[in-house]
C-alpha cells in the first residue's frame, strides 16, 4: 500500500496554536508530511485560489491525497481514526471516558477563555512579545483556567490521563500564554506546562517558528 501524500498548511510565522496542535498530532503519529505556509496578514487565505478557501479559510488545513480538512480538533480525530492504534501511535486516551474528556478539554480551550487569547496572543509564546497587564476580564479568565486545570490534573502526574495525549499540548499552550509572559501562575501548573513544552514534537515546532521569526 502506497503512503499517502500529506500536506499541512500553516500561517507564515508558525504562531497559530491550532497549527501547533495539528503538527504535534502528525508528528506523534509518526507520519511524513510536507509543510506549506500562507500569509494571513496579506489575506492570502481569502483568495479563491487557495486550497483552503472552500473549507473554513483558516489554518491549519490538512491535505491527504485529494481530501482536505480544517479545524485542528477535527484533524486530530481524523488522524486517530485513519491511522489508528496499535499500528500507529495513540494521540487520544484508550479509555472511553478519558477520550471523551480529552475532546471536551479541546473544545473548551477553543471556545472559551477569549480574554486570555486576546490579551496573551501566541506571539507571546513563540516570539517573546510583551503585552499590557491583564485586564479584570483577563484576570478572571486566568482564574477560571487555573481552577479548571487544577481540577483536571491528578496530583503528582505529569499528564492529564497518565499517558500523554493531544489535549495535554493544547492545555499547556493555553497555560504558557501566561507563564511565558511572566504572569503569575500556580506553581503546579507552571511545572505541568513546562514539562509538556519539552516534548520533542513541540520543540520541533518551536524551532520552526523561531526560524521563521528570526
Swiss-Prot record:
Q: What is the lineage of its organism?
A: Bacteria, Pseudomonadati, Pseudomonadota, Gammaproteobacteria, Enterobacterales
Residue ranges of the GST C-terminal domain?
A: 95-214
Tell me what this protein is called.
Glutathione S-transferase YfcF
Stretches assigned to the GST N-terminal domain:
6-87
pH dependence, record text: Activity decreases as pH is lowered from neutral to acidic.
Q: Which family does the similarity line name?
A: Belongs to the GST superfamily.
Tell me, in a sentence or two, what this protein's role is. Answer: Exhibits glutathione (GSH) S-transferase activity toward 1-chloro-2,4-dinitrobenzene (CDNB); however this activity is as low as 1% of that of GstA. Also displays a GSH-dependent peroxidase activity toward cumene hydroperoxide. Is involved in defense against oxidative stress, probably via its peroxidase activity.
User: How would you summarize its activity regulation?
Assistant: GSH transferase activity is inhibited by S-hexyl glutathione.
Q: Which InterPro entries match?
A: Glutathione-S-Trfase_C_sf (IPR036282), Glutathione_S-Trfase (IPR040079), Glutathione_S-Trfase_N (IPR004045), GST_4_C (IPR034338), Thioredoxin-like_sf (IPR036249)
Question: What keywords would UniProt list here?
Answer: Oxidoreductase, Peroxidase, Transferase
UniProt GO BP = glutathione metabolic process; L-phenylalanine catabolic process; response to hydrogen peroxide
Might you give the EC number(s) for this enzyme? 2.5.1.18
Class in the EC hierarchy, top level: transferase
Alphabetical list of Pfam families matching this protein: GST_C_4, GST_N_2
Knockout-associated phenotype: Deletion of yfcF decreases the resistance of the bacteria to hydrogen peroxide.
Q: For this protein, what is any one GO molecular function term?
A: glutathione transferase activity
**What's the catalysed reaction?**
RX + glutathione = an S-substituted glutathione + a halide anion + H(+)
Amino acid at each position: 500500500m502506497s503512503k499517502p501524500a500529506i500536506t499541512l498548511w500553516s500561517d507564515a510565522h508558525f504562531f497559530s496554536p491550532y497549527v501547533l496542535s495539528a503538527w504535534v498530532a502528525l508528528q506523534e503519529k509518526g507520519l511524513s508530511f510536507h509543510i506549506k505556509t500562507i500569509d494571513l496578514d496579506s489575506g492570502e487565505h481569502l483568495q479563491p485560489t487557495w486550497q483552503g478557501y472552500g473549507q473554513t479559510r483558516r489554518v491549519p488545513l490538512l491535505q491527504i491525497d485529494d481530501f482536505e480538512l480544517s479545524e485542528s480538533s477535527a484533524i486530530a480525530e481524523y488522524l486517530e481514526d485513519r491511522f489508528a492504534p496499535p499500528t500507529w501511535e495513540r494521540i487520544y486516551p484508550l479509555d472511553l471516558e478519558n477520550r471523551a474528556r480529552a475532546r471536551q478539554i479541546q473544545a473548551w480551550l477553543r471556545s472559551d477563555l477569549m480574554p486570555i487569547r486576546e490579551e496573551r496572543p501566541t506571539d507571546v509564546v513563540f516570539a517573546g512579545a510583551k503585552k499590557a497587564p491583564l485586564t479584570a476580564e483577563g484576570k478572571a479568565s486566568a482564574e477560571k483556567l487555573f481552577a479548571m486545570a487544577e481540577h483536571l490534573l491528578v496530583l503528582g502526574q505529569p499528564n492529564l490521563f497518565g499517558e500523554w495525549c493531544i489535549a495535554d499540548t493544547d492545555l499547556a499552550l493555553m497555560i504558557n500564554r501566561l507563564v511565558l509572559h511572566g504572569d503569575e501562575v500556580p506553581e503546579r501548573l507552571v511545572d505541568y506546562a513546562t514539562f509538556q513544552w519539552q516534548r520533542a514534537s513541540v520543540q520541533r515546532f518551536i524551532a520552526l517558528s523561531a526560524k521563521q521569526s528570526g
